[in-house]
């Protein structure tokens, strides 16, 4: 059986990267929430 996690740097960046987050209103909310918490890494 194939495992569910098949790592790919490109897919990771496209789905969870900073630019992907900034592209939607809810994504911008995610970034804002992570900034408010003081996260060192905002996105993938």
From Swiss-Prot:
One function term, GO molecular function aspect: structural constituent of ribosome
GO BP of this protein: translation
Keyword list, A-Z: Ribonucleoprotein, Ribosomal protein
Pfam families: Ribosomal_L34
Alphabetized PANTHER family for the sequence: LARGE RIBOSOMAL SUBUNIT PROTEIN BL34M (PTHR14503:SF4), MITOCHONDRIAL RIBOSOMAL PROTEIN 34 FAMILY MEMBER (PTHR14503)
Protein name: Large ribosomal subunit protein bL34
Family indicated by similarity: Belongs to the bacterial ribosomal protein bL34 family.
HAMAP family: Ribosomal_bL34
Gene Ontology cellular-component terms listed: ribonucleoprotein complex; ribosome
UniProt keyword annotation of Transcription regulation present: no
Stored NCBIfam families: rpmH_bact
InterPro entries associated with the record: Ribosomal_bL34, Ribosomal_bL34_CS
Presence of the UniProt keyword Manganese in the record: no
């Amino acid at each position: 059986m194939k495992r569910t996690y098949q790592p790919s740097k490109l897919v990771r960046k496209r789905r969870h990267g900073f630019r992907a987050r900034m592209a939607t209103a809810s994504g911008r909310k995610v970034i804002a929430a992570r900034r408010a918490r003081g996260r060192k890494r905002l996105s993938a």
